[in-house]
From Swiss-Prot:
Encoding gene per record: rpsG
PROSITE patterns with a match to the protein in the record: RIBOSOMAL_S7
The protein's name in its UniProt record: Small ribosomal subunit protein uS7
One Pfam family per UniProt: Ribosomal_S7
GO CC entries: small ribosomal subunit
Subunit structure, as described in the record: Part of the 30S ribosomal subunit. Contacts proteins S9 and S11.
Keywords assigned: Ribonucleoprotein, Ribosomal protein, RNA-binding, rRNA-binding, tRNA-binding
Gene3D superfamilies, sorted: Ribosomal protein S7 domain
Family: Belongs to the universal ribosomal protein uS7 family.
């Protein structure tokens, strides 16, 4: 615990094209080795492709894709009397957003060969429809929490 109280969360400036912090966070997740301009090109092109496929506003596509992949509950390990229990806990909003973005990016990276723009667009479209890697991860997490609901009273 820091003596000066809890640290204030960093504020990420909105991206210049859409004026959205969500897009800026996605760009930062895509970025590898500090190559931000390359990450921006990938994200903007992916959003353009996804919005054309769905005939929807790019920000609306991204927002719905993230909403469909945000976990509501997850399990945390807790050791009680020599046994380790998986205890379901609610996911804070910031962590839920971080997990959703991470799963979308990882799902795009795991999609075989091809350009990252197209893979990210495909993952965004799948997440928008509630399918794909990110949605599958969310369902796994929810299933795990549901299976361990009996230990919810052990929450700390």
């Amino acid at each position: 615990m820091p003596r000066g109280g809890s640290p204030t969360p960093r504020t990420i400036p909105a991206d210049p094209i859409y004026g959205s912090t969500l897009v800026a966070k996605l760009i930062n997740k895509i970025m590898i080795g500090g190559k931000k301009s390359k990450a921006e090109k990938i994200v903007y092109e992916a959003l353009r492709i996804a919005s054309e496929q769905l005939n929807e506003d790019p920000i609306a596509v991204l927002t719905k894709a993230i909403e469909n992949t945000k976990p509501l509950v997850e399990t945390r390990s807790r050791r009680i009397g020599g046994a380790v229990y998986q205890i379901p806990v609610e996911v804070p909003e910031r962590r839920a957003l971080a997990l959703a973005l991470r799963w979308i990016v990882n799902g795009a990276r795991d999609r075989g060969a091809g350009e990252m723009e197209k893979k990210l667009a495909a993952e965004l479209v799948d997440a928008y429809k509630g399918q794909g890697y990110a949605a599958k991860r969310r369902e796994e997490i929810h299933r795990m929490a549901e299976a361990n609901k009996a230990f919810a009273h052990l929450r700390w």
